[in-house]
Amino acid sequence: MSKPVDHIKRPMNAFMVWSRGQRRKMAQENPKMHNSEISKRLGAEWKLLSEAEKRPYIDEAKRLRAQHMKEHPDYKYRPRRKPKNLLKKDRYVFPLPYFGDHDPLKTGLSMSATDSILGASEKARAFFPPTSTPYSLLDPSHFSSTTIQKMTEMPHTLATSTLPYASTLGYQNGAFGGLSCPSQHTHTHPSPTNPGYVVPCNCTAWSASNLQPPVAYILFPGMTKAGIDPYSSAHTTAM
């Protein structure tokens, strides 16, 4: 970067006055030494000098400063600042080497590895509770026609097979008979919004009058249940 023509140099301090001759001497003795290394060595040597050895250079720096103020009375030191575009570049620059197309970070992760990672996330969904992913686990494509048919028959199976005491106690039209909906249409079908669920058609709700709890009896020797309740004959047959 070229300096403007009207640029005024800053007056030298005592170290600059001393190092001006020492730098030239050290550069001649070590021609392959870098300028930054020369500056480091000169700074270390300057700190080792005593106050008496520094005094002539301090006095020379004062004289040069007074002469500079006389020649440039309006001079004001303005440190050189970096342009804003350079500051923005430095803010986002990272000291990482660039390997081009042979970067191991790029070639190390192949497409098959990426596919396996995505597949592992899909396999992990099987271990999640159903409430966390209700729609992904109930995808219609995951169910066969036989599975859907078994799901439609599930309410009737519950009404007949899992409640054996309903038929033996003569409660077909009582508390347990409401499950099978004998007087209504019993067809079921998958829900249109969520095929994983089965929705019954035209099944009436249970009424409070039909919910009759079974009666418990305590029988003593010589007593029978005849004449106690109307269900005695049915219960005797079941026993």
UniProtKB/Swiss-Prot annotation:
A Pfam family reported for this protein in Swiss-Prot or TrEMBL: HMG_box
- The source's domain of life comes to Eukaryota
BP GO terms, sorted = brain development; negative regulation of DNA-templated transcription; negative regulation of transcription by RNA polymerase II; nervous system development; neuron differentiation; positive regulation of transcription by RNA polymerase II
Q: Where in the cell is it found?
A: Nucleus
Q: Which UniProt keywords apply?
A: Developmental protein, DNA-binding, Nucleus, Repressor, Transcription, Transcription regulation
**One cellular-component annotation, GO:** nucleus
Signal peptide region: none
Query: Is Transcription regulation among this UniProt entry's keywords?
Result: yes
Q: What does this protein do?
A: Acts as a negative regulator of transcription. May function as a switch in neuronal development.
The protein's name is Transcription factor Sox-14
